[in-house]
């Protein structure tokens, strides 16, 4: 059994601060040395004397320092040692009476810690200055278990106050699902923003808290999803705020009426002349949506053939087939004038085939207007076959190029277009077309076969800086 002792203290405040931590100690006193320590109380000559107590107040392990022990000492003393201590040390301590020794033994017992009373303080002549310090030092140890229990109880109460209560579970629906449910249940199939808020709060009590947070998300979902359309108020329905309804072409966005997961994302086709309309961003659970479904105005369901770029390429191809062949009077100035429409190629490509486009007088001008907008659009592999301009850094003589993979008739048709396109791209304004290229009108009208060797050695190798068989 070991007892621990705190040393080097001058004032009462120092001792109180030392014993705030019950695990702090410097040295230990064996229980077997207790009687010898009590017997040597008279011969204290190391750091202090029992009568004066004027030195620094430090005690050696051989001195009587049991009154300054921390809780480990009281718990480490056996009942026999505590009971035998008063009788064995009564005769050895001249300055202490039997009552004081008894009080000391009572104070050292685990059940009587903090029982230092006025009787012991009066009987201990030498320890008088420290009698007042013993009670404050021992009392925290006496009440330590109860204090710990009280602190645990108090901590439990505080933990309950800090614990967040969830009276209602969050519904497993995205904001788009909530808006769709609210609009579909309305008799008029359209609601204002405040009515959507109210419907959600009435049906789901979870959203009655933190309203500003989720209402912002509702507004963003309405603005950034094309399936929701804003409808202006009619004169017969005065009030504040516009109505929101579902897009007529959105259809059933949710599979089998289940709002837990959206089946597909609705994407509205933007007309070239339309100025408004929602953005194309995603809101709510848009990132988790299924594959996008683009709807053609004519009702076509093929997603690869109804994009505006695809229709624009087909429209231009149809115009090229029906365009008159340029006569000998088609000078480069005329071609440049018609090629000026290439700046608006992006808007022209978005025009559907059914719309009426202004006729282009020269075929090469139409050829130049299509490839000019190619760098801003990415084409699918089957669409790149219909495109009239290839990558300038790609060799057309590559074994796996798209030209070699096409049929012979399509390849000749493609190379015929290539001649005009390359001539328009690389020839300076006002200069004549290269004489080595077969640019006669007969080659356009009759589609006469053109050998690849007639185009590549004379022109392509001089234009491209990279090798002919470059695979990049």
From Swiss-Prot:
GO annotations under biological process? alveolar secondary septum development; anatomical structure formation involved in morphogenesis; anatomical structure morphogenesis; cell differentiation; chromatin remodeling; dopaminergic neuron differentiation; dorsal/ventral neural tube patterning; epithelial cell maturation involved in prostate gland development
Q: Which organism is it from?
A: Homo sapiens (Human)
Q: Where is the composition biased (Low complexity)?
A: 322-332, 351-366
Q: Which UniProt keywords apply?
A: Activator, Chromatin regulator, Developmental protein, DNA-binding, Nucleus, Phosphoprotein, Repressor, Transcription, Transcription regulation
* Ranges of compositional bias, category Gly residues: 273-289
- Organismal lineage: Eukaryota, Metazoa, Chordata, Craniata, Vertebrata
Gene Ontology cellular component terms for the protein in this record:
chromatin; fibrillar center; microvillus; nucleoplasm; nucleus
The record ties this protein, via PROSITE patterns, to: FORK_HEAD_1, FORK_HEAD_2, FORK_HEAD_3
Which CDD domains does the entry mention? FH_FOXA1 (cd20038)
Checking InterPro entries in the record gives:
Fork-head_N (IPR013638), Fork_head_dom (IPR001766), Forkhead_box_C (IPR018533), FOX_domain-containing (IPR050211), TF_fork_head_CS_1 (IPR018122), TF_fork_head_CS_2 (IPR030456), WH-like_DNA-bd_sf (IPR036388), WH_DNA-bd_sf (IPR036390)
Task: Return the SMART domains for the record.
Answer: FH
Query: Subunit comment for this entry?
Result: Binds DNA as a monomer. Interacts with FOXA2. Interacts with NKX2-1. Interacts with HDAC7. Interacts with the histone H3-H4 heterodimer. Associates with nucleosomes containing histone H2A. Interacts with AR. Interacts with NR0B2.
Q: Which residues bind DNA?
A: 169-260
This protein is called Hepatocyte nuclear factor 3-alpha
Where Phosphoserine occurs, residue numbers? 307, 331
Q: What does this protein do?
A: Transcription factor that is involved in embryonic development, establishment of tissue-specific gene expression and regulation of gene expression in differentiated tissues. Is thought to act as a 'pioneer' factor opening the compacted chromatin for other proteins through interactions with nucleosomal core histones and thereby replacing linker histones at target enhancer and/or promoter sites. Binds DNA with the consensus sequence 5'-[AC]A[AT]T[AG]TT[GT][AG][CT]T[CT]-3'.
Q: Report the GO molecular function annotations.
A: chromatin binding; DNA binding; DNA-binding transcription activator activity, RNA polymerase II-specific; DNA-binding transcription factor activity; DNA-binding transcription factor activity, RNA polymerase II-specific; protein domain specific binding; RNA polymerase II cis-regulatory region sequence-specific DNA binding; sequence-specific double-stranded DNA binding
Tell where it localizes. Nucleus
For whether the record's keyword set contains Glycoprotein, the answer is: no
What domain of life is recorded for the organism?
A: Eukaryota
Region labeled Disordered — which residues?
A: 269-392
Write out the tissue specificity statement of the associated record: Highly expressed in prostate and ESR1-positive breast tumors. Overexpressed in esophageal and lung adenocarcinomas.
């Amino acid at each position: 059994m070991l007892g621990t002792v705190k040393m080097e203290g001058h004032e009462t405040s120092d001792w109180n601060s030392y014993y705030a931590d019950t695990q702090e100690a410097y040295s230990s006193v064996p229980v077997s040395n207790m009687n010898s320590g009590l017997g040597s109380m008279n011969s204290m000559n190391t750091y202090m004397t029992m009568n004066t107590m004027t030195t620094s107040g430090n005690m050696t392990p051989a001195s009587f320092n049991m009154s300054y022990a921390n809780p480990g000492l009281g718990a480490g003393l056996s009942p026999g040692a505590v009971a035998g201590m008063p009788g064995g040390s009564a005769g050895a301590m001249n300055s202490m009476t039997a009552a004081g020794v008894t009080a000391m033994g009572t104070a050292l017992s685990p059940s009587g810690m903090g029982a230092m009373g006025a009787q012991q303080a009066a009987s201990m002549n030498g320890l008088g200055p420290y009698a007042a310090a013993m009670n404050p030092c021992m009392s925290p140890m006496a009440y330590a278990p109860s204090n710990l229990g009280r602190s645990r109880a108090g901590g439990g109460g505080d933990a309950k106050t800090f614990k967040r209560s969830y009276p209602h579970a969050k519904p497993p629906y995205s904001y788009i699902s909530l808006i769709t449910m609210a609009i579909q249940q309305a008799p008029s199939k359209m609601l204002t923003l405040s009515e959507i808020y109210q419907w959600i709060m009435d049906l789901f009590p979870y959203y009655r808290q933190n309203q500003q947070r989720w209402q912002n998300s509702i507004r963003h979902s309405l603005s950034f999803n094309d399936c929701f359309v804003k409808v202006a108020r009619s004169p017969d329905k005065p009030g504040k705020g516009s109505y929101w309804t579902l897009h007529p072409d959105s259809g059933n966005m949710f599979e089998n009426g289940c709002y837990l997961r959206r089946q597909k994302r609705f994407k509205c086709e933007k007309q070239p002349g339309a100025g408004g309309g929602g953005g194309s961003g995603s809101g709510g659970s848009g990132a988790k949506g299924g594959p996008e479904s683009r709807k053609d105005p004519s009702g076509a369901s093929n997603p690869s053939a109804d994009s505006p770029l695809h229709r624009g390429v087909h429209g231009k191809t149809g115009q090229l087939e029906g365009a008159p062949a340029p006569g000998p009077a088609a000078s480069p100035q005329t071609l440049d004038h018609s090629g000026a429409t290439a700046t608006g190629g992006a808007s022209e490509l978005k025009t559907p085939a059914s719309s009426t486009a202004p006729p282009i007088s020269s075929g090469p001008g139409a050829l130049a207007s299509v490839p000019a907008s190619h760098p801003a659009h990415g084409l699918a592999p089957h669409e790149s076959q219909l495109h009239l301009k290839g990558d300038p850094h790609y060799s057309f003589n590559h074994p796996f190029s798209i030209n070699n993979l096409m049929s012979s008739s399509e390849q000749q048709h493609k190379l015929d277009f290539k001649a005009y396109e390359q001539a328009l791209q690389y020839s300076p304004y006002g200069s004549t077309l290269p004489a080595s290229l077969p640019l006669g009108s007969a080659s356009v009208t009759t589609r006469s076969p053109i050998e690849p060797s007639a185009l590549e050695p004379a022109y392509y190798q001089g234009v491209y800086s990279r090798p002919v068989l470059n695979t990049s």
